[in-house]
Every structure is written in structure tokens, then in C-alpha cells.
Amino acid sequence: MTKNLLDFDLDGLAAFCEQLGEKRFRAVQLFRWIHQRGASDFARMSDLAKSLREKLSGCAHVAALPVISEHVSADGTVKWLFDVGDGNAVESVFIPEDDRGTLCISSQAGCAVGCRFCSTGHQGFSRNLTSGEIVAQLWFAEHALRARLGTQERVISNVVMMGMGEPLQNYTALVPALRTMLDDHGYGLSRRRLTVSTSGVVPMMDRLSQDCAVAMAVSLHAPNDALRDQLVPLNRKYPLRELLDACTRYLEHAPRDFITFEYCMLDGVNDQPEHARQLIDLVRPRGGEGVRCKFNLIPFNPFPASGLHRSNPQQVAAFAKMLSDAGIVTTVRKTRGDDIDAACGQLAGDVKDRTRAAERMARQRTIVLKPVA
């Protein structure tokens, strides 16, 4: 079986080339051709020795993910659905802005965490993506957008691991993919412009801080354990105190001096003044050292199976003001791509569920979710 070269970071590719009797500088050349120029045909790689190109043709390939569909929003957001085999498909979303281009990437086919407000969680979980399948989303999007815009300049300046899946539950594939994105011979992203979003897998947060510390976002969504247990089931394993301690440890190594807490605003569930006061006490405890953080309030994007509703704009604004008045930097996420189901929490793809999530979620829909003070 031939090797997919998208699976390798530069060190891995150098080791592979060494097995072929080649020096490291050949791996650098090959890496640049693949990631900077978007080449998948070894015959195009003109500065590689013909003998190496022939070797590669017999033992390696560059495997793009088949594109099932592409949708473009009225606001310019682009969503791609990629086929990852065995009846599974994952989604990636490009969000253009005046000063940046952000790509939201998936790390798993489905998700096993099962957050109540997330469409992906309702799809269940099939499998982890490989490093190559993670990188292939960036590889395709970057070079497809360059071709569309008629430019050789970099289009994607920021990558967020906020698509389908919990990245830190796919750690062994995640880290080589991050290293490829950061490598100056690859995509050359700054550690500050590469963000991993987690629902709070505490041991892997500690490992990432040592192995490949990039910007960190944490899906918080509740100010106390009782409510977070309902919204983010992983909280039952790693409760808030453990999670916040992990955030503090992570900041010792992080490229940014704050953690971004993501907070999906759910009408009547987690959006009341008391919840804001509890959040303030959580991250700014009286008499204790708090977590350096900012909050990103996310308007909920409804989907039929959730049984939940979006907080009204006035409630979101009042909630944000309470946090801001307490000295916490707070933003409200602008909804992008909701007309093509590309907004936060809407990515679902097509998942061959191996966790019976649909059955569990159907049972949960009969339970009235109530805020817990």
C-alpha cells in the first residue's frame, strides 16, 4: 500500500525519504511542493531528481479528499462536504473577512462528546480522521481558493479546529497535522493564528501544552457543574475546577496570554443574569487568582432535534455587558454562513454512527432541560 504524504509532518516526511535513501533537504523540497504549491503529481516537481520522482510514484501518493458538495453563502462563507469513506462525510468552512481568512476544520467523523446544542453530537461518532485527512481540508481549501481568486498569495491566515469532532480525543493525528500547519515549509501559520477548541479533555490539554502549544479555546457553555453536566456530558469526567486549573497550566506555555471561553447562548437555560454572575465568580474568584480569559458569546444556531432556542439579542447584549463591566473582555460572535448550515454548531456532515447517539438524543428530547442555579 502506498503512503499518503499528507499524513506526514516534515520530520515524518524526512524519515520516509531517508528510507528511500534520500537526504533531508529532499523532504523539504517535497514538503514545499505539496503544501505551498498544492502539487499532487510528482512529475510536476521539477527540482526533484528523476530517480526520486520514480521512487515516489511507486510507493507514495498525495490524497485529496473527494468533494461531495460546495455551498457559498450570501456573505461569502464557503462550506465543503468531503467524503472520508465508509459512508462518512465531514465539513470544512472558510470564513472571509477584511483582515483575515479563517478555515474551520473537522477532526473526527462525528463526535462522541454529545453536547446538547451541537448538531454534530446528534449525528453520533464513527471514527477519528487521520493526520492526512485533517491536513487535506486545509490543502484543498487553500489551493482551491487561490485558483478561484487568481492569486499565489496565501488566502487562509487562520485555522480553527472547531469543525466536527473533539480534536483532543484524536490527539495522535492532531499533533502532526498542527505541526504541518505551523511549519514554515508548509503553511507557515503563527501559533497565535492556529486555535484548538476543546470541550475540556484535561489530560490532553496538558499534553498539548508540552507538545505543540497553540491558541486554546474551551467550550464552556455553563457557569456551574450541575448545568454543564447536562449541556456538555464530558463535564462529568472533568468538572469545572479541574478544567479551569488545566487552563491556568496551559497558559504557562500558550502563545496567547488568555484562554477563549466559548459560550453558546440558550434561551432560558444559561443566559440569565445569575448565570453571568456565576461566570464572573468562576473566572474571577474573590480572594483568589482567576483565569486570564476572554468570552466569546455564540448565538445558538437551532436545528430540529435540539429542542433548544436562541437567546434574543437584547438578552445576549445584557449578558455581555455584565461580563464586560466585571473587567472580562467579551465579544459576541457574528453569525456567518447560517443560510448554508455552516454556522457554529450546525456542522453535521454525514456520519455512520457507531455510538447510537441518535437513540440517546431521542431519549433526551423527552427530558426538559432546566437551568440549575
From Swiss-Prot:
Its main location: cytoplasm. GO terms for molecular function: 4 iron, 4 sulfur cluster binding; metal ion binding; rRNA (adenine(2503)-C2-)-methyltransferase activity; rRNA binding; tRNA (adenine(37)-C2)-methyltransferase activity; tRNA binding. CDD domains: Radical_SAM. PROSITE patterns: RADICAL_SAM. One of its GO terms (biological process) is rRNA base methylation. The keyword Lyase does not apply. Binds 1 [4Fe-4S] cluster. The cluster is coordinated with 3 cysteines and an exchangeable S-adenosyl-L-methionine. Its EC number is 2.1.1.192. Keywords: 4Fe-4S, Cytoplasm, Disulfide bond, Iron, Iron-sulfur, Metal-binding, Methyltransferase, rRNA processing, S-adenosyl-L-methionine, Transferase, tRNA processing. The keyword Translocase does not apply. Its cofactor is [4Fe-4S] cluster. The active site is at residues 91, 344. Pfam families: Radical_SAM (PF04055), RlmN_N (PF21016). GO terms for cellular component: cytoplasm. It comes from the Bacteria. It catalyses: adenosine(2503) in 23S rRNA + 2 reduced [2Fe-2S]-[ferredoxin] + 2 S-adenosyl-L-methionine = 2-methyladenosine(2503) in 23S rRNA + 5'-deoxyadenosine + L-methionine + 2 oxidized [2Fe-2S]-[ferredoxin] + S-adenosyl-L-homocysteine; adenosine(37) in tRNA + 2 reduced [2Fe-2S]-[ferredoxin] + 2 S-adenosyl-L-methionine = 2-methyladenosine(37) in tRNA + 5'-deoxyadenosine + L-methionine + 2 oxidized [2Fe-2S]-[ferredoxin] + S-adenosyl-L-homocysteine. Residues 97-339 form the Radical SAM core domain. [4Fe-4S] cluster binds at residues 111, 115, 118. It is found in: Cytoplasm. S-adenosyl-L-methionine binds at residues 165-166, 197, 219-221, 301. PANTHER family: 23S RRNA METHYLTRANSFERASE (PTHR30544), RADICAL SAM CORE DOMAIN-CONTAINING PROTEIN (PTHR30544:SF5). Specifically methylates position 2 of adenine 2503 in 23S rRNA and position 2 of adenine 37 in tRNAs. m2A2503 modification seems to play a crucial role in the proofreading step occurring at the peptidyl transferase center and thus would serve to optimize ribosomal fidelity. NCBIfam families: rRNA_mod_RlmN (TIGR00048). Belongs to the radical SAM superfamily. RlmN family. Reaction proceeds by a ping-pong mechanism involving intermediate methylation of a conserved cysteine residue. This is Dual-specificity RNA methyltransferase RlmN. The gene is rlmN.
